[in-house]
Regions:
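N-terminal export and membrane-targeting signals
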Residues: 1-6
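Extended, solvent-exposed, non-transmembrane regions
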Residues: 10-191
Length: 191
């Protein structure tokens, strides 16, 4: 995986509404997250599998010790018996969103990226710059293969981020100016 794929996970903070439980079952429903910018410290990224009721999903798990995010938007469309229902959350239009000990399981991402003091190809178990891998299933993190490929960086900077993800967890989220909208039909965030 290339370093820019890792940015996918970093933006997932939009879905959080506070600290999540120590473990949870992944819904199997993807969501979109966009942001104008993300600055993070203590970055790690590795491949894993999320377990859902519909089977295993391959993901790029990204961990950040801390992240500051501007113009965050998260959108999900949920199929229901009465039609699609969308939920859109926005925060960080003025004061930045803050996330601590952030993990996100992502599948797709577009952004401009800069990595500082990056190591590519380190064993996942030997990462030291980010929060590191966790026991499979802990805080929504997928099962990884011990000794497998990972990358890490001291700091990261992403702009114009648009990503798809399955799950996010964090120790703490602060979402200034949080707004939520629920409506019939589909939802999409636009940078």
């Amino acid at each position: 995986m290339v370093p820019s794929v890792a940015a996918t996970a970093a933006i997932g903070v939009a879905i959080a509404q506070g600290a999540l439980a120590a473990s949870f079952s992944v819904s199997g429903q993807q969501f979109q997250v966009t942001a104008k910018s993300l600055d993070g410290t203590g970055f790690v990224q590795y491949g894993a599998l999320d377990q859902t009721k519909k089977g295993n999903k391959p993901v790029a798990v990204v961990g950040l010790q801390s992240a500051k995010i501007t113009n965050l938007c998260q959108a999900v469309t949920i199929p229901t018996p009465i039609g699609d229902v969308s939920m859109t959350l926005k925060a960080g239009g003025g004061e930045q969103v803050d996330a601590q000990k952030l993990y996100i399981d992502a599948t797709d991402m577009k952004a401009n990226a800069r990595f500082d003091e990056v190591d590519i190809g380190v064993a996942v178990d030997a990462t030291t710059k980010g929060p590191g891998p966790a026991t499979p299933g802990e805080n929504g993190r997928g099962a990884y293969v011990p000794g497998s490929f990972a990358q890490q960086a001291k700091t990261v900077h992403f702009t114009d981020v648009d990503q798809k993800a399955w799950a996010t967890s964090a120790g703490t989220f602060t979402l200034p100016g949080l707004t939520m909208n629920v409506a019939m039909g589909g939802a999409e965030c636009k940078n």
